[in-house]
C-alpha cells in the first residue's frame, strides 16, 4: 500500500480590480510503490512493493496584472509558474549501473537526490594515439573489484531529467481596433543526454558506417588524427577491438568504450529553454465601415506559432523538447465576416 501525507497552503488575492494572485505551497511525503523484477522460477516477471520514502514540495502561482484599462487602450500581463523539489529517502531496492545511467522518475536511486536524477561516466578525454574515449574512476585493480561497490563511486551525478522550474508569460495589448497577443514559456533546470552520432551504426558490421546510409554530420568533427583530442570530444571511428568489454569496479560489464562515451557527462547538456510560442495580431473593422458593406462585423487576424526558441547551442538546431527533430514554425491568416 502507498501512504501519502499532504500539507497545502493557498492564498487568493485581488487588488483594485487590477491585480490578481493565486499562490499555493505544498509538501508531500509518501512511501513509494515500485516495480521490482523477480527471478524466473517465481513464475511472474515482476511485482509491486514499497521501496522507499519520497519527499516532495513545491510552489505554484498565477499572477494577472492589468496596469491600463481604458476605452481605446488596454494592457494585460499574465504569469504562471511552478517550482518543485523532490528527493528520495531510504530505499530497499538494488540498483545497477544501468539504472543510474538511465535515471528514473518512479524509483529512488540514491538517498538525498531528486527522483529524476541520473548519473554518467566521467569523461577524461580522448586517447591521442587512436581517438578512443577514456574515463575517470573506472579502472581499479582486479583485487579491488567487488559486487558490493556502489556505482556512484565511479559515476558522476549529471542532474535532473525533470525541470525544477516552469513558467509561462502572456501579454495582451489593445489599441482601438488593433490587438496583439503573445505567449512565452520558460523551462529551467533539466538535463538531457544528447543523441550519439554513432547511434545509427547500431547493428552494422564492426560499427562502421554503411555507405548506403546517411550519417550524422557531427562526425565531421570527430577525432581523425593525433592532436585532434585538443579540439573535439567525439571519438574517432572505432579501430580498436570492438568486442572489448570494460569490467567495472562492481564487476558489471560495460558494452564498449563507445557505449560508455555515449553515457558519459560529455554527452549531457542543459535542456533549459525560453520559447516564444505564439504571436497573434488582429484588427476589427469599425461598425460604420461594416454598415457600408452590409456586414455585422469583420475582422482580420494573423498568427505565428513557435516563433523562436533560445536553448543550448549543443542541440545543433534541434528542438530541446523534441531532441532529434525540429518543431515547425507555422503561419496563418484569417478573415471573419458576419452578416
Locate each region found by the language model.
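C-terminal beta-signal and terminal closure region of outer-membrane beta-barrel proteins
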Residues: 51-56, 101-130, 205, 219, ...
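Outer-membrane beta-barrel channels and translocator barrels
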Residues: 4, 16, 28, 56, ...
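Short loop/turn motifs that connect adjacent beta-strands in outer-membrane beta-barrel proteins
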Residues: 18, 68-75, 88-93, 110, ...
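Membrane-embedded beta-barrel scaffold of Gram-negative outer-membrane proteins
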Residues: 1-43, 82, 86
Amino acid at each position: 500500500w502507498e501512504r501519502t501525507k499532504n500539507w497545502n497552503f493557498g492564498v487568493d488575492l485581488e487588488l483594485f480590480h487590477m491585480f490578481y494572485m493565486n499562490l499555493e505551497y505544498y509538501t508531500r511525503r509518501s512511501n513509494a510503490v515500485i516495480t521490482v523484477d523477480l527471478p524466473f522460477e517465481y513464475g511472474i516477471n515482476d511485482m509491486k512493493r514499497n521501496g522507499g520514502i519520497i519527499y516532495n514540495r513545491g510552489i505554484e502561482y498565477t499572477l494577472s496584472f492589468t496596469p491600463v484599462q481604458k476605452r481605446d487602450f488596454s494592457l494585460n500581463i499574465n504569469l504562471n509558474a511552478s517550482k518543485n523539489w523532490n528527493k528520495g529517502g531510504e530505499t530497499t531496492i538494488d540498483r545497477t549501473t544501468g539504472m543510474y545511467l538511465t535515471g528514473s522518475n518512479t524509483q529512488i536511486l540514491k538517498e538525498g537526490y531528486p527522483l529524476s536524477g541520473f548519473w554518467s561516466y566521467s569523461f577524461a578525454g580522448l586517447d591521442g594515439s587512436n581517438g578512443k574515449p577514456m574515463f575517470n574512476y573506472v579502472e581499479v585493480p582486479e583485487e579491488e573489484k567487488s559486487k558490493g561497490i556502489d556505482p556512484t563511486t565511479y559515476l558522476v551525478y549529471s542532474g535532473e531529467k525533470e525541470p525544477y522550474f516552469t513558467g509561462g508569460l502572456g501579454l495582451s495589448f489593445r489599441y482601438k481596433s488593433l490587438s496583439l497577443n503573445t505567449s512565452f514559456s520558460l523551462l529551467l533546470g533539466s538535463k538531457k543526454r544528447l543523441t550519439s552520432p554513432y547511434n545509427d551504426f547500431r547493428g552494422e558490421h564492426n560499427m562502421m558506417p554503411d555507405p548506403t546510409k546517411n550519417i550524422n554530420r557531427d562526425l565531421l568533427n570527430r577525432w581523425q588524427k593525433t592532436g585532434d583530442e585538443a579540439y573535439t570530444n567525439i571519438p574517432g571511428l572505432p579501430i580498436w577491438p570492438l568486442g572489448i568489454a570494460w569490467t567495472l569496479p562492481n564487476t558489471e560489464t560495460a558494452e564498449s568504450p563507445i557505449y560508455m562515451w555515449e553515457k558519459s557527462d560529455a554527452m549531457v547538456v542543459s535542456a533549459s529553454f525560453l520559447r516564444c510560442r505564439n504571436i497573434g495580431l488582429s484588427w476589427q473593422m469599425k461598425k460604420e465601415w461594416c454598415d457600408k458593406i452590409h456586414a455585422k462585423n469583420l475582422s482580420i487576424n494573423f498568427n505565428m506559432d513557435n516563433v523562436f526558441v533560445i536553448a543550448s547551442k549543443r542541440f545543433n538546431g534541434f528542438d530541446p523538447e523534441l531532441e532529434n527533430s525540429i518543431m515547425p514554425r507555422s503561419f496563418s491568416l484569417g478573415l471573419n465576416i458576419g452578416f
